[in-house]
């Protein structure tokens, strides 16, 4: 339930940044969020392998307490933009979904992109336990360090947006994700193939994610948290769906089944962008 807290930082960064630096601010915060997710896999993999799963949660709780202190001390207090009741707030979110086609499209892209991403990361540990790898969760977690390279590279989206349109950045980002699945299919039984694929899928997802959020935060300056609520709810629903389908695909078809799931969601993401994005050229 409280894992929603980091998502509040994204609209906060957008609100605090000057207009010309909004994309860079969102990119920086989102890179931190995704790198944290990836590094947590390294952390949990090694700690779980050598100390046990309980220690993972104990150390995590201590770190969150320390982080709470830093947030309390250093983050500025921002007054809410919405002055109505909670019921009216919920109605306004529904109204945003109805009246903002770019929000709906960005949410769908985010959901399908994160579904493909989650399909890979959910089943990677199963894949590495099988031939020809025969390794444990510590090695699977170490791939998070590799993925962090792609996530950090995506922080440059803010600078790239000054050269390319957001629509084109999203298009190329989805293509990068699609290429990553090509590596997983052709070279997924080699370490180097997985490494290249991990860098590409993290780069592609993060670049698209930052671009999506740049779009939605530009829709209504006073509705940053509300549009982010719609987007991130869709995003995590997509991730849960990708996890569920990929786990079942692994049971029945092993690695090839997972690749098929990833390619399916990525293609749906690409097709929706091409068909429904009015600014796509």
Predicted regions and their residues:
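Helix-to-loop junctions at the C-terminal end of transmembrane segments
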Residues: 152-166, 250
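Juxtamembrane intracellular "pre-TM" segments in multi-pass secondary transporters
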Residues: 76-107
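C-terminal transmembrane helical hairpin of 12-TM major facilitator-type secondary transporters
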Residues: 167-212
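Pair of pore-lining "gating" transmembrane helices in MFS-fold secondary transporters
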Residues: 99-119, 199-200
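Helix-loop-helix hairpin linking two adjacent transmembrane segments in secondary transporters
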Residues: 28-75
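A late C-terminal transmembrane helix in Major Facilitator Superfamily
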Residues: 218-255
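Cytoplasmic helix-loop-helix junction between adjacent transmembrane helices
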Residues: 1-31
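Helix-loop junctions on the cytosolic side of multi-pass membrane transporters
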Residues: 71-85, 275-281
């Amino acid at each position: 339930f409280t894992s929603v807290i980091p998502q509040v930082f994204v609209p906060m960064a957008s609100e605090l940044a000057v207009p010309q630096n909004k994309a860079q601010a969102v990119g920086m915060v989102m890179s931190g969020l995704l790198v944290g997710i990836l590094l947590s896999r390294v952390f949990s993999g090694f700690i779980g392998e050598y100390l046990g799963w309980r220690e993972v949660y104990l150390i995590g709780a201590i770190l969150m307490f320390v982080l709470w202190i830093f947030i309390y001390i250093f983050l500025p207090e921002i007054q809410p933009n919405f002055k109505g009741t909670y019921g009216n707030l919920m109605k306004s979110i529904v109204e945003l979904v109805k009246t903002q086609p770019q929000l709906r499209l960005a949410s769908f892209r985010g959901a399908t992109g994160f579904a493909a991403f989650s399909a890979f990361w959910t089943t990677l540990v199963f894949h590495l336990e099988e031939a020809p790898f025969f390794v444990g969760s510590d090695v699977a977690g170490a791939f998070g360090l590799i993925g962090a390279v792609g996530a950090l590279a995506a922080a440059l989206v803010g600078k790239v947006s000054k050269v390319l349109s957001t629509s084109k950045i999203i298009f190329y980002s989805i293509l990068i994700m699609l290429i990553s699945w090509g590596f997983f299919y052709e070279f997924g039984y080699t370490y180097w193939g997985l490494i290249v694929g991990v860098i590409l899928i993290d780069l592609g997802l993060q670049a698209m994610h930052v671009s999506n959020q740049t779009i939605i935060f530009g829709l209504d300056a006073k509705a940053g948290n509300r549009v982010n609520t719609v987007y991130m709810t869709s995003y995590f629903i997509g991730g849960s769906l990708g996890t569920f389908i990929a786990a079942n695909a692994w049971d029945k078809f092993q690695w090839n089944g997972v690749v098929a799931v990833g390619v399916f969601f990525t293609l749906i993401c690409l097709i929706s962008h091409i068909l429904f994005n009015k600014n796509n050229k």
